[in-house]
Amino acid sequence: MSIQIEHPAGGYKKLFETVEELSSPLTAHVTGRIPLWLTGSLLRCGPGLFEVGSEPFYHLFDGQALLHKFDFKEGHVTYHRRFIRTDAYVRAMTEKRIVITEFGTCAFPDPCKNIFSRFFSYFKGVEVTDNALVNIYPVGEDYYACTETNFITKINPETLETIKQVDLCNYISVNGATAHPHIESDGTVYNIGNCFGKNFTVAYNIIKIPPLKADKEDPINKSEVVVQFPCSDRFKPSYVHSFGLTPNYIVFVETPVKINLFKFLSSWSLWGANYMDCFESNESMGVWLHVADKKRRKYFNNKYRTSPFNLFHHINTYEDNGFLIVDLCCWKGFEFVYNYLYLANLRENWEEVKRNAMKAPQPEVRRYVLPLTIDKVDTGRNLVTLPHTTATATLRSDETIWLEPEVLFSGPRQAFEFPQINYQKFGGKPYTYAYGLGLNHFVPDKLCKMNVKTKEIWMWQEPDSYPSEPIFVSQPDALEEDDGVVLSVVVSPGAGQKPAYLLVLNAKDLSEIARAEVETNIPVTFHGLFKRS
């Protein structure tokens, strides 16, 4: 990328501070010119409450969900936010303590209860969080905020009011679902979640929610499982955050970061644990890649294998002359990256933040190429015949296909993460450009654009400025893939600056078009979408 900016003032700590919700939208001060065609709402979510009374949350993914909205109309911008009224939030506010265990924070029984009632409360089963702080996605005409459990929360995208909690277990066989479903052009939703398969072993189900039909029945009522992927360990599913989808195929990457279900069901219920306590790494399995035929709903028993890495975000997946191209934001090795995302680490002074990041898995953007047709006579050969990639796939004598990637980007402690593309037109298809959030030792301090064919990089960066995931919005009359703008929420705690602003960049070269400043701090946000008016 470019010269690394240092952060000795520690302004990034503002990303992890509690804020209050707003009673009404704020008018933003716009400099530059917002394109008049940009009409709609940028919706984002993330943690906004980092403690309840005297009880702190400990992990980045623990804070209570705050829903944000920037409205664009005729070149003007307003900003609004409200806490999502999940069970976790409402009960915490009512009891003035953390009531439901979060990703890295344990909830303990009410200290006012006697020892017998506290003991028996542990045997009521695991109480799963509905803290919907990770992403927002549409189902039919509705919008849902989500985490990665079986609960999703229906919200009103206009008022930011919470409508209701939905338990996916009531409709489909999954223990949870990722926060990164795929949405097809007709509104069909695909997602993945682990489940209990045959003989009580763990598997992964691909679920499909159809588009809204003329009968106006809630599409979630018509959810179905379309294919099932086997698990490499019958009692320890891998952590899954996203997956790949093309018009004809589904790609699932099974990493060595595992959920120990015995620990989840026993330790948690009996003496208290949190989600992070239940993760472990399989140091010998490497990574398994699975493929299924989407239309025929058939699992391919091709044994794709490669060396270990963590994976959270797929960039894009597409078909190319009998091969699948799978572009990923990887973290090298089998150790869980989330071990380094405790708030105490992220709030350290800059030199300590860098020291901690030096110990963590290192990021790399990779392209894997998966051959769909396998012939045993090719044992020992590289099966990749595409001229435009250095990625390889070698058939071994044990019938596994060993994959080596083409590296699209690699920088020491510099990650290209939270990737976005022109998804509406190029999701699941050959593409050229990806946009990402640049992490400098886990601190988000730049926005990036990558040409995945030439590996050229463009970048936006300013001192004491901490952007969010870039959201690409195509202009209505777009002729080229990158005709449009990139939107990002920037926290700017430096002297002489407003606390935060919405940044509008030209998607061609990441030059600034406009910014809309607000007189309030905005904590870290993870994911979101642009909803056109």
Curated annotation (Swiss-Prot):
Entries under Pfam families matching the protein: RPE65
GO molecular function, one term: all-trans-retinyl-palmitate hydrolase, 11-cis retinol forming activity
Residue positions where Phosphoserine is found in the record: 117
Subcellular location: Cytoplasm; Cell membrane; Microsome membrane
GO cellular component: cell body; cytoplasm; endoplasmic reticulum membrane; membrane; nucleus; plasma membrane
Modified sites of kind N-acetylserine: 2
Entry keywords, A to Z: Acetylation, Cell membrane, Cytoplasm, Disease variant, Endoplasmic reticulum, Hydrolase, Iron, Isomerase, Lipid metabolism, Lipoprotein, Membrane, Metal-binding, Microsome, Palmitate, Phosphoprotein, Sensory transduction, Vision
Domain of life: Eukaryota
Name of the featured protein: Retinoid isomerohydrolase
Gene name of the record: Rpe65
Modified residues (Phosphothreonine): 101, 105
Effect on the protein of changing residue 477 to G: Knockin mice exhibit mild age-dependent degeneration of retinal structure and function; Knockin mice exhibit adequate isomerization activity with an accumulation of retinyl esters and a delay in rhodopsin regeneration kinetics and diminished electroretinography responses
UniProt keyword annotation of Acetylation present: yes
Changes seen on gene knockout: Mice exhibit changes in retinal physiology and biochemistry. Outer segment disks of rod photoreceptors are disorganized, rod function is abolished although cone function remains. Mice lack rhodopsin, but not opsin apoprotein. Furthermore, all-trans-retinyl esters over-accumulate in the retinal pigment epithelium, whereas 11-cis-retinyl esters are absent.
Details of cofactor binding: Binds 1 Fe(2+) ion per subunit.
Free-text tissue specificity from the UniProt record: Retinal pigment epithelium specific.
Post-translational modification: Palmitoylation by LRAT regulates ligand binding specificity; the palmitoylated form (membrane form) specifically binds all-trans-retinyl-palmitate, while the soluble unpalmitoylated form binds all-trans-retinol (vitamin A).
Species name: Mus musculus
GO biological process: circadian rhythm; detection of light stimulus involved in visual perception; neural retina development; retina homeostasis; retinal metabolic process; retinoid metabolic process; zeaxanthin biosynthetic process
Disease connection: Defects in Rpe65 are the cause of light damage susceptibility (LDS) of the retina.
N6-acetyllysine PTM sites in chain numbering: 113
Residues where Fe cation binds: 180, 241, 313, 527
Positions of S-palmitoyl cysteine lipidation: 112, 231, 329-330
EC numbers: 3.1.1.64, 5.3.3.22
Source taxonomy: Eukaryota, Metazoa, Chordata, Craniata, Vertebrata
Family stated for the protein in its record: Belongs to the carotenoid oxygenase family.
